[in-house]
Amino acid sequence: MINFEAIIGIEVHVVLNTASKMFSKAPNRVDNQKINHFIDPIDLGLPGTLPQVNELAVYKALLLADALKMKTVTNKLVFDRKHYFYQDLPKGFQITQQNYPFAKNGVVTINVDAIEKPIYIDRFHLEEDTAKQHFNHDQILLDFNRCGAPLIEVVTLPVINTAKEAKAYLQKLRQILIVNNISNAKLEDGSMRSDCNVSVRLKGQRQLGTKIEIKNINSLNNVEKAIDLEINRQVKALINGETLSQATLSFDDKTNNNVFMRKKDNTIDYRYFIEPNIMTSNIDDLLLEKPVAFQLEQFQKELIDSNVNPQLVQLVVDDATIFSAFQTINSVIKNPQETIRWLCIELIGQLNKTNSSLTANLIQDLITLIEMLKAAKVNQKQAKQLITLMIETKKDPKSLAKLHNLEQITDPKELQKIIKKIFQENEKEILKNIDRIERIQKLIIGQVMHKTNNRANPQQVFIIVENMLHEVRERDS
């Protein structure tokens, strides 16, 4: 690889998390138990149907443009027809944006091995998804639930040079999509799909090498593997004097190898023309206000500067469900460090052990539990026990605390009664060691916690013990 360099460009298809599809009112859902259930005559291209633009999809596109520091090409929203015949496209064309992409000239800054690098975005456009194909021996089965789902296709310039950089770019883009609630961006379920175009050339050479496309990569780690495999294959071929031909490959995660799919001989003529059934519209007329993107890098910096473990920060921004839970909890608790600790370490840690899912009820219960902690109704140990019980029983922490006797004793009168009895039981020991105050404090506090099964509030116990010892010393002096 010393005399060669890789040139990589990436196209990413992102399924937007809107309630309905791009041009119809059909639910934007994929459910393997309900095949061909969420469909509409518009998605199937039935005669007499007219597409309607999903305004929320336009809003999310504007949000992404702001997050990627892009400018809309024009304030006009224009769609085109891309014609090709394939079984997953019932209309015989796809509604997309060819001549007027939604936005151009963006940037995502990545950090690889402590070196920052800008990855430049050429453009992105809105379009509709195709049906999902299922291959069953000699049959191709089609699920039209996905057909018509709102997509954004993000295209980089060929400025990526290593598999590590490609992975870092996709991870950063994914985080931007998640924190701005644009998409769930899960590679494993197809809501974020990347096509990596890889070529190799001699260092210093201006002309690009033969481009090979790699599709169907279902994880960030596999993106890195697939690109490294292809770079090494191309370098070896060039060293051996072989001629490379344009082709499309697929990554097989079972064998950890790239598999040949088809040749790419000529540029296909898709016969683009403006979609006649969607009027050119003014974006400002569609939306009441322009959205402002969530500042991902600022958010990460503030948390890390507050001594939050960087790995926990990554965990929050890498998962749409966890980030949404963080936002919900922290909007009430208003303490990001405590929110991350109880959400990521305690709750999600227990969920992972039991292979359970994070639910809306658990999120609300965790808010209640943290508030109970702040009000000293439970201590740290009790809170951890309650999390386990919340997951097992699906009951709220207040009722569980009462049921399992896990509430902290904070009533001063009740604590004084317990401590007074311990003083009486240990009177000789106390008087004997009255000048060794720390030893006596530890002895009494330990017995209080033992007698109350760690339910006594430690701070209040300490104050009461300190006052009572002061009285004993005053009396005996």
Curated annotation (Swiss-Prot):
Record-annotated disulphide pairs: none
Matching Gene3D superfamilies: 1.10.10.410
Keywords: ATP-binding, Ligase, Nucleotide-binding, Protein biosynthesis
Keyword Repeat annotated: no
Gene Ontology molecular function terms on file: asparaginyl-tRNA synthase (glutamine-hydrolyzing) activity; ATP binding; glutaminyl-tRNA synthase (glutamine-hydrolyzing) activity
InterPro entries per UniProt: Asn/Gln-tRNA_amidoTrfase_suB/E, Asn/Gln-tRNA_Trfase_suB/E_cat, Asn/Gln_amidotransferase, Asn/Gln_tRNA_amidoTrase-B-like, GatB, GatB_Yqey_C_2, Gln-tRNA_amidoTrfase_suB_CS, Gln_synth/guanido_kin_cat_dom
Domain of life the protein comes from: Bacteria
GO biological process: glutaminyl-tRNAGln biosynthesis via transamidation; translation
The enzyme's E.C. designation: 6.3.5.-
Pfam families: GatB_N, GatB_Yqey
Catalytic activity: L-glutamyl-tRNA(Gln) + L-glutamine + ATP + H2O = L-glutaminyl-tRNA(Gln) + L-glutamate + ADP + phosphate + H(+); L-aspartyl-tRNA(Asn) + L-glutamine + ATP + H2O = L-asparaginyl-tRNA(Asn) + L-glutamate + ADP + phosphate + 2 H(+)
Subunit architecture: Heterotrimer of A, B and C subunits.
Protein purpose: Allows the formation of correctly charged Asn-tRNA(Asn) or Gln-tRNA(Gln) through the transamidation of misacylated Asp-tRNA(Asn) or Glu-tRNA(Gln) in organisms which lack either or both of asparaginyl-tRNA or glutaminyl-tRNA synthetases. The reaction takes place in the presence of glutamine and ATP through an activated phospho-Asp-tRNA(Asn) or phospho-Glu-tRNA(Gln).
Assigned protein family: Belongs to the GatB/GatE family. GatB subfamily.
Protein name, per record: Aspartyl/glutamyl-tRNA(Asn/Gln) amidotransferase subunit B
